[in-house]
């Protein structure tokens, strides 16, 4: 039995009658699965059957940092997962640790957190487990993958470390350098240096109290950093803050802080330079950047594209390239026109590399 979300218990007190308009449960056709990593975590995956019938490889979607799988499946009008399913692809979302995850609890009856996980565990444990699970359940020898933000960076680490089982992949708003200027570049290394790597960064609680701000205050911090209101509505961002945000591990933030200071993302033991390893990647990868993305500026995303061995393609989402408005960070997966301007580009790439 799944435990009730603390969020669903406190939202009514915070938002009164408006809670019902924010929280949209998963639809009945969503199948919830769990896959156990070698180091003992149970990851949550959600499956949507292809409609009307499968016409291509299964697709696995992965969220960004301090997020969960609902980022790729927020509601009926903003769901990359349901969109791909409606276009003939059996589609899965995965929530990386600790989002929707349990450690050491068979059956998921009692969550127990395991401290100290970082980027390496996402690359070596979580993504291989999710890919293997989807391949096993579907019987597909290869699957396609799309990752937003951190979900794309983890994909880079997976492919650079020799990860197998992917036919084609897309990364959306995924920086491979964090030393090129950005709103948190100076702050995160200072904060991360003060905190214990076994702690968790509490993103979920503060996001609840930011919900009214996102709807009432123009040019608020989330608007300035995370999205362009010409693409993504305040209501959509309020929903994201209500049930799409999760705490994250400080060890992960410390590795990313090192990336901000040195320009290189390395494994904790220093043996792997993840960006340098991209030169040996042969899986086709589409790299998508948002023209107005302040979390993952265009040069930072372009660094990943340049490092890839290929085959590869680059796509910039902005007015100068035919979009109605310049895309911010979350717009790529939650924007009002993402289903007509962004996701078809990803699907077309997958289809061209499945022949």
Regions found by a protein language model. Name each.
Residues 136-141, 146, 150-264:
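Alpha/beta-hydrolase-fold enzymes
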Residues 7-17:
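Bacterial N-terminal signal peptides
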Residues 114-136:
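Alpha/beta-hydrolase active-site loop
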Residues 50-100, 105-108:
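Short, surface-exposed "cap/lid" segments of acyl-processing enzymes
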Residues 21-50:
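N-terminal cap/lid segment of alpha/beta-hydrolase-fold proteins
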Residues 283, 297-307:
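Short alpha-helix in the alpha/beta-hydrolase fold that links the catalytic acid
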Residues 313-355:
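Catalytic active-site module of serine/aspartate enzymes centered on a nucleophile-bearing elbow/loop
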Residues 281, 287-289, 293:
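Short beta-strand/loop motif that positions the catalytic acidic residue
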């Amino acid at each position: 039995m799944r435990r009730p979300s603390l969020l669903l218990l406190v939202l009514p007190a915070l938002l009164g009658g408006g809670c019902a308009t924010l929280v949209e449960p998963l639809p009945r056709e969503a199948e919830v699965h769990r896959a156990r990593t070698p180091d003992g975590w149970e990851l949550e995956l959600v499956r949507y059957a292809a409609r009307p019938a499968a016409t291509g490889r299964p697709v696995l979607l992965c969220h960004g940092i301090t997020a969960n799988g609902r980022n790729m499946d927020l509601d009926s009008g903003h769901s990359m997962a349901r969109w791909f399913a409606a276009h003939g692809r059996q589609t899965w979302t995965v929530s990386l640790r600790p989002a929707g995850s349990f450690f050491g609890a068979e059956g998921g009856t009692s969550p127990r957190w395991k401290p100290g996980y970082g980027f390496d565990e996402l690359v070596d444990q979580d993504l291989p487990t999710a890919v293997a699970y989807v391949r096993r359940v579907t019987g597909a020898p290869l699957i396609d993958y799309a990752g937003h933000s951190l979900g794309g960076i983890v994909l880079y680490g997976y492919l650079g470390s020799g990860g197998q089982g992917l036919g084609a992949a897309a990364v959306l708003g995924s920086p491979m350098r964090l030393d090129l200027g950005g709103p948190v570049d100076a702050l995160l290394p200072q904060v991360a240096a003060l905190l214990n790597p076994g702690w968790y960064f509490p993103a979920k609680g503060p996001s609840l109290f930011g919900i009214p701000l996102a709807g009432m205050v123009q040019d608020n911090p989330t608007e300035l950093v995370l999205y362009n209101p010409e693409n993504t509505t305040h209501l959509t961002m309020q929903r994201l803050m209500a049930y799409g945000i999760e705490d994250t591990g400080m060890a992960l933030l410390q590795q990313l802080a090192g990336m901000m200071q040195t320009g290189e993302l390395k494994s904790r033991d220093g043996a792997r330079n993840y960006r340098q390893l991209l030169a040996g990647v042969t899986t086709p990868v589409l790299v998508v950047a948002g023209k107005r993305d302040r979390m993952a500026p265009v040069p930072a995303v372009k660094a990943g594209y340049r490092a890839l061995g290929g085959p590869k393609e680059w796509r910039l989402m902005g007015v100068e390239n035919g979009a109605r408005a310049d895309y911010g960070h979350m717009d790529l997966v939650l924007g009002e026109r993402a289903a007509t301007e962004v996701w078809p580009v990803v699907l077309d790439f997958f289809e061209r590399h499945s022949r």
